[in-house]
Amino acid sequence: MKKIDGGVTAPQGYLAAGVKAGIKASGNHDVAVIYSTVPAACGAVFTQNKMCAAPVLVSREVNKQPYAQAILVNSGCANACTGAQGIEDAKKMQDHGAELLGIEPEQAFICSTGVIGHFLPMDKLLTGIADAIDAMDETEGESCAMAIQTTDTFIKKAAYETEIDGKLVKIAGIAKGAGMIHPNMATMLTFITTDCAIAPDVLKRAVKAAADKSFNMVVVDGDTSTNDSMIVLANGLAENEIILSEEHPDYPAFFEMLVACATDLAKLIAHDGEGATKFLEVNVVGAASWQDAKTAAMAIAKSPLVKTAFFGEDPNWGRIVCAAGYSGAEMIAEKVNLEIGGVRLVENGMNCNVPAERLAPIMAEHDISMTIDLAAGEEKATVWTCDFSYEYVKINGEYHT
């Protein structure tokens, strides 16, 4: 497997574009389209927030189909908490794009992101969809990635290629997300394309499994959004022997590539946490179960006290072991060990009395890894997060305006 440059148009048979439709007050790109030139197996996972937005309800119906061909996206307005009109507007968005693309509406996923509680500006949106479809080609992946952003500070993309059944198979993805990140899948927008030939039912299961290993292991602020989604299209144009089950000899290679792409995007989202100055990797080892390991890691990663300590470059390890302790994960307290940046701070549940000056260079780094051993078993899990800064409060205090 090899990492390559490129966005969602890197695999064969995909066109994309992003345009400025005037939905965002900033005037930035705000409408995007991703299109497969042939029907593609599809798989998706969506937010578990019970106040899910209208486009999520519509796209869940699309995901019941084996194949799809398009993803239509707007940013700047979430179309959430908009009642019956929101559903009607979402379907108009879907119908309009499908008609222009010459496909059935149920072959078009739709996604929206932005401020909750406002109706979509339909005239601008429908014009934007038409403009994006007119502009789409194999070189416009960058503008497409720009158009799905809200408070993001940089484009998030990843791509890989590998040989499957003697054929060169590519996978590529883009993502949006900086705040409201505590996926259960999902709390972000993620779109992945591949030219691998894989059966729709196998792809749907693979997408859920990949989300659990990547996006569901990221937390920025502990909030779960109303909108966001992970959607994968696989159009088969690589012409490998179709992967019909998880037992197929080529399935592991495909799944490894899918997880790698998703994990890269997930880490980029943690790097771009609103106002973030640190990227934090939380490793839990020695857990009684994988779920316990994830539970403890999430508790540490979500803790405002932990996140603010890292912003202040304060090696307050007590906050880390405290969060693990209240997480509910099984542990043997008198055997717990903790390291930050490879330096042992806690051994057998007690302070190692490491001098502050030894830790200062580690705490000043942008990327910091910590590992806590619960001494309760052999399982492990890793969660990615970021710190909480003054800027995070400022961004979210001013977001609506």
Annotate the PLM regions.
Residues M1-N74, A78-D89, A98-T401:
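A structural signal for small-residue-enriched, beta-sheet-centric alpha/beta enzyme cores
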Residues Q94:
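Generic structural marker for isolated residues within well-ordered, non-membrane alpha-helices
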